[in-house]
Swiss-Prot record:
Binding site for Fe cation: 111, 115, 304
Name listed for the protein in its UniProt record: tRNA N6-adenosine threonylcarbamoyltransferase
Subcellular location: Cytoplasm
Origin species: Helicobacter pylori (strain ATCC 700392 / 26695) (Campylobacter pylori)
Top EC category: transferase
Source organism phylogeny: Bacteria, Pseudomonadati, Campylobacterota, Epsilonproteobacteria, Campylobacterales
Length: 340
């Protein structure tokens, strides 16, 4: 088995993945959302301190799953990029300690690659090559995944990420963090879903294949300020619905532009923000229109988790892509390349 560790942001997670058949044997996770909610976003120093507390607790649960028999573990895998430096280092320190004490090889995994492999948890075979939309609090990307060693970025955000924009809109409406499920519920509760959108679709007439949410976010801010004296629940629902609809339509329009160029046969959606049901439905319709197979990460594995890191590290294990402890380091940025 491979013991995998994830600590790139505000989720502490450990998992055990069986090498022979890619089955997830154990998966444990502690979310920090309640600790960061009062700040309206993740506080790096607080996240680091909580990882230092939570990772050892999760390791104890792993020990119970193994009946304290660590001989079943053949390698340690750790997310080392991209992410918050102060949280990545907490996971890396644990991984190094385990690798040294158990005399096991160390695998360094890219967090974005891990999200791609969230599509294949509990599956020995992958459906690569495929294209992937990754939407989360930190990223809005289209990736082309040819195989484990060839995953490249073909489109990214010029400013805020999709998930980050939901967090900021929720904060504008004084509704808390994380904003994704909060704004999604506002949209679901809105009673007039068929009216024309009140917010502009970003980059609608731009030839660039990219994402942008800052202009949409600013339009929401102006609407909130206009209604500030009477920002009741009905108005919040209206703003939430129209913002979500415009944000998703922007993803659809840009992805449609990509589809017309590349005509992918298989398209995946991953990342924490991919739990949004309206987004999933919109992409079902888009893929149907282009005769493209849609694959979705299971809801429980959309947000950051060690199971996806364990699954992706199986490929590295088979290729013996191990890293000496003295060369193991972290990076706040991904080293995945962009297509020219």
């Amino acid at each position: 088995m491979i013991l995998s560790i994830e600590s790139s942001c505000d989720d502490s997670s450990l998992a055990l993945t069986r090498i022979e058949d890619a089955q997830l044997i154990a998966h444990f996770k502690i979310s920090q959302e309640k600790h960061h909610s009062s700040y309206g976003g993740v506080v790096p120093e607080l996240a680091s301190r909580l990882h230092a507390e939570n990772l050892p607790l999760l390791l104890e649960r792993i020990k119970i799953s193994l009946n304290k028999d660590f001989s079943k573990i053949k390698a340690i895998a750790i997310t080392n990029q991209p992410g918050l430096s102060v949280t990545l280092i907490e996971g890396l320190m644990m991984a190094k300690a385990l690798s040294l004490s158990l005399n096991l090889p160390l695998i360094l995994e890219d967090h974005l690659r891990g999200h791609v492999y969230s599509l294949f948890i509990n599956e020995k075979q992958t459906c690569m090559p495929l294209s992937v939309l990754l939407v989360s609090g930190g990223h809005s990307l289209i990736l082309e995944a040819r195989d484990y060693e060839n995953i490249k970025i073909v489109a990214t955000s010029l400013d805020d990420s999709f998930g980050e924009s939901f967090d900021k809109v929720s904060k504008m409406l004084d509704l808390g963090y994380p904003g994704g499920p909060i704004v999604e519920k506002l949209a679901l509760d809105y009673r007039h879903p068929n009216e024309p959108l009140m917010f502009p679709i970003p980059l609608k007439n731009s030839p660039n294949l990219a994402f942008s949410f800052s202009g949409l976010k600013n339009a929401v801010r102006l609407e909130v300020e206009k209604n500030a004296p009477n920002l009741n629940e009905a108005i919040k629902q209206k703003i939430g619905y129209h913002f979500q609809s415009a944000a998703i339509e922007h993803l659809i329009q840009q992805t449609k532009r990509y589809f017309k160029i590349k005509r992918p046969k298989i398209f995946g959606i991953v990342g924490g923000a991919s739990q949004n049901l309206a987004l999933r439905k919109a992409f079902e319709n888009l893929c149907d229109a282009f005769d493209c197979k849609l694959v979705l990460a299971p809801l429980e594995f959309c947000s950051d988790n060690a199971a996806m890191i364990g699954r992706s590290s199986l490929e590295a294990y088979q290729k013996k892509r191990f890293v000496p402890l003295e060369k193991a380091n972290i990076s706040p940025r991904t080293l995945l390349k962009s297509f020219e």
